[in-house]
Each structure stands twice: as structure tokens, then as C-alpha cells.
Amino acid sequence: VEKKQLPHMLCVTNLLLHGIEVPSQIVHDNTLARPLRDYTAADRVNVILTNPPFGGIEEPGIEAGFPADVRTKETADLFLVLIQHLLKPGGRAAVVLPDGFLFGEGVKARIKEQLLQHCNLHTIVRLPGGVFAPYTGIKTNLLFFTKGQPTQHIWYYEHPYPPGVKNYNKTKPIRIEEFDAEKAW
């Protein structure tokens, strides 16, 4: 599901170019517009891997589809509530979130509390600046968690720049080889 027209079109075009004749699984819609209570057991999944949009504000009324204690217009916060809801027991998630989520108060704190109580947040990898340049310079984190058990211990790792690198950008992006320390762990 993709809310914005251009990314939706690019995704469908990419699938067509790679031999998927009818990419019917790619829907142009707002995932957050469906009230949480309307999701059933059939909608639950084992794995969610996502980079939800952050820094965005949802259109009026979207937050009404979420429980009162976690209502917000902040897109990334609503996605984290939805992700927790959609995971089956034992389901796993990897989510890219900004620093603002980790250190925020109010609704963010309540969402984090629910995450820690209902999921085992076992790993946080803090990414260096520029990883998503030129689209955003916001510092980001990778959160890995499994639904069904409360959090006991969190492995926190700050991913360093390699020697000689001061920042990432569009022409010099982060490379997969730079994650060897995380893979070895």
C-alpha cells in the first residue's frame, strides 16, 4: 500500500519492468485510514519490514481510528501502533524510525511503553547522519522486535562512519559491507 501517487506509480512500473504482468498487490491508498478495530486475525502477518514516513502529519480524522491513549497525527507513531497490531504472536519487525521517536514524550512515550510491554525490542542500531540523504538529514534508528514477550534486554549499537568518511550522500551512500559488525553480532 502506498499513499503517494509518484512512489506508487514507480513501484508498479518497476514490477512491470521485472515481469510482473499484473501487480495487483500494490494498492494506492492510505494504510492508516483503516481503523485499527477493523483489522482481523486474517490480516495478521509474521514479518514486517518498513521505513514508514516520518515527520509527516496525517489528515484530520485518521487518528480517530486508533485507541485514545495513542492518538496522534504523527505518521511514524501511528505506523508503529499499526505494526504492533498487525504482527502475529511471534511475528518479527524491522522498522526505521527517527531519533524523535526514541526520545519523545507524551504519546511517543506511551507507544514505546506498549512496545516494550508487548514486544521484545531486542536491537536498536543507530545509523549515522546522511544515510537517507538527500531526502532527509534526520538521524535514524533501526528497531528490531518480536511480538509476544516483553523486552528484557536491548542491544544498542551506534553504527560508526568508516575511516575517512564524514558523511553519506546520494553519490557516496552507505554500503552493505559496512554492516559486518552487526552481522557478526
What are these language model-derived features?
Residues 1-2:
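Conserved acidic E/D residue at the C-terminus of a beta-strand in Rossmann-like folds
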Residues 6-42:
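S-adenosyl-L-methionine
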Residues 36-185:
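A conserved structural/catalytic subdomain of Rossmann-like adenosyl-cofactor enzymes
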